[in-house]
Design a protein with these regions (language model features):
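Short, well-structured N-terminal submotif of metal-dependent ribonuclease cores
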Residues: 1-34, 46-58, 122, 130-132
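Acidic, PIN/NYN-like endoribonuclease modules and their adjacent C-terminal/linker elements
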Residues: 2, 35, 39, 67, ...
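Noncatalytic, solvent-exposed loop/strand surfaces
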Residues: 28, 58-61, 72, 114
Length: 132
């Protein structure tokens, strides 16, 4: 079983935020998976927020399994609901869904992506985030 982490979760593993400790505990030694686009999203986010931590972001990405984009995934992402979900977020949800029985949880701190994951029937987790 693997955890699919979107970029909002990956940032919390590189930059200390309020949910970082609970997320680290939740992840533990589990396999971390994401889509190839996470590399670009994470490095760009860290370069904006905390440029000195870019090497830490690169190390994190090196420890993960990154799933390549394919025609099938991009086609599936086009139909992820709701239609207001941003395109890159839809790609994350479609990629997480492609893991089927191997997915323990889609880990995200993006409320829209969490809702989309739930609509797609995926288990969703946001360790440390209040339900408010």
């Amino acid at each position: 079983m693997a955890l699919y982490l979107d970029t909002s979760a990956l940032v919390k593993l590189v930059v200390r935020e309020s949910e970082s400790d609970e997320l680290r505990t939740f992840v533990g030694a589990r396999e971390m998976v994401s889509c190839q686009i996470a590399r670009t999203e994470l490095i760009r986010a860290i370069a904006r927020e905390q440029p000195r931590s870019v090497p830490d972001a690169e190390d994190l990405i090196a420890e993960m399994t990154l799933i390549a984009l394919s025609r099938l995934l991009t086609a599936q992402a086009a139909w992820v609901k709701p239609p207001v979900l941003r395109s890159l977020d839809a790609l994350h949800v479609a990629t997480a869904a492609s893991l089927a029985g191997d997915l323990e949880a889609l880990v995200t701190y993006d409320r829209r992506m969490a809702e989309a994951g739930q609509m797609a029937g995926l288990p969703v987790a946001s360790p440390g985030m209040s339900a408010a």
